[in-house]
Amino acid sequence: MRVGSLRIGGIFSLCSLLTDTLVDFSVKFPGIKVKMVCKSGRRLFEMLQNNELDFALTFESPVKDDLLDSIELFHSPLSVIVHKNHPLAKLDKISLNSLRGYSLALPERGMHVRDILEERFPDIMQNLKVQLELNDVNILYQLINTNHWISIMPQSTERDDENLRAVKLNESNTDVQAALYCRKGSYYRNAAKVFIEMLQKSLSENVAIYFLKNKI
């Protein structure tokens, strides 16, 4: 492949998983122009349906879309993300109801992880103290690092930060599936096929993702 283009999308919390593959792909195929966007899950699905993207990396849609195909990559449990010095950091597991007395910083409504939480645990979410809502996952993790707020995020999004801890939830139905989505029946460009293969290989070599896939 000497020339061509590739249009990739990812939700904010998973875009970092594309970095290594983007570097390797661009070095190997310098003539391929890559456009990458980080958006909310809802916006990515809209862009796929409008043929504005070749594929998108995101967690499962709370609402099934019969117009999209998916390639499953891995499952990740929703976890409570806290600073290592937070009282909750010493726990192995915790229930959502136990978080009522704590100040939470969460992705804003309309972002994929928040939609999943609201859809699966509507009654509990209404009673939690959500003090901050953000549309930037990087800032969200910076705020957790202050040890003032806690958050609920998929474990796979936890940054490589020795100051943060992920505490598993007691509730069932906490796993979320990360997948590549494309339009049903769409033709994969050669560039897209190669990138997807490289991404799958990169994720298979990612130690944290390996542990999630094998539930170790």
Question: Predicted segments — roles?
Answer:
Residues K28-F29, Y141, Q155-N163, S172-I216:
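C-terminal effector-binding regulatory domain of bacterial HTH transcription factors
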Residues D65-I71, H75-S76, L91, S98, ...:
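Beta-alpha-beta core module
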Residues V3-F29, K33-K35, R42-F45, R109, ...:
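N-terminal winged-helix
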Residues M1-L6, N97-G101:
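Immediate post-signal peptide segment of exported/extracytoplasmic ligand-binding proteins
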Residues G4-G9, A56, I81, A105, ...:
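Short, well-ordered beta-strand segments
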Residues L17-L18, A89, Y102-I124, Y188-A192, ...:
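Secondary-structure junction motif
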Residues D20-D24, R42-L78, V82, N145-T146, ...:
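Short beta-strand-centered segments that line the small-molecule binding cleft or hinge
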Residues S40, L44-E52, F59, H112-V167:
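Hydrophobic hinge/microswitch elements
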